[in-house]
């Protein structure tokens, strides 16, 4: 849990975060290969925190409370873990799921653990003129307010998708390492200040 407390209490590193804002990690998606075939029906019957409805979805959905996460476990032995708030927590959760599967009698291993997506968010605390931003950054932006209230900004370097809302709230998704989230935010921050709405 130590990881989560860091952002609020420690001074922000001005070299890594010149804006003074550190995006908060909201969700980590990771994958791991348990490297053995699994009987999903048997798992669902024996594990109390599992649900399996093969007509709806071809995986067992399992949840644990600490770290609060959800796993999708496939018959091939592949597993997806979502919901953790840090990379370490995601790995810890994935290990816990692997251990549950082992305890049910399957020779589960822990191969090729990989972070697939990091979702972060932050608030620049000022409103943004999305029309102006979309117009001047047309190559990267799509903004259709009648379909979705946010501007979708597809950054090339790092390859991150940002959802930018008029309120100044930002969601960043697509990172494989948290530094990409931070870099993407620092890249967009000067653009956001440029399109700051003047308060009436």
Swiss-Prot record:
This is TATA-box-binding protein. It is found in: Nucleus. The lineage of its organism: Eukaryota, Viridiplantae, Streptophyta, Embryophyta, Tracheophyta. Gene3D superfamilies: TATA-Binding Protein (3.30.310.10). GO terms for biological process: DNA-templated transcription initiation. Belongs to the TFIID complex together with the TBP-associated factors (TAFs). Binds DNA as monomer. One of its GO terms (molecular function) is DNA binding. It holds the Pfam family TBP. GO terms for cellular component: nucleus. General transcription factor that functions at the core of the DNA-binding multiprotein factor TFIID. Binding of TFIID to the TATA box is the initial transcriptional step of the pre-initiation complex (PIC), playing a role in the activation of eukaryotic genes transcribed by RNA polymerase II. Belongs to the TBP family. It comes from the Eukaryota. Sequence repeats lie at residues 25-101, 115-192. InterPro entries: TBP, TBP_CS, TBP_dom_sf, TBP_eukaryotic. Keywords: DNA-binding, Nucleus, Repeat, Transcription.
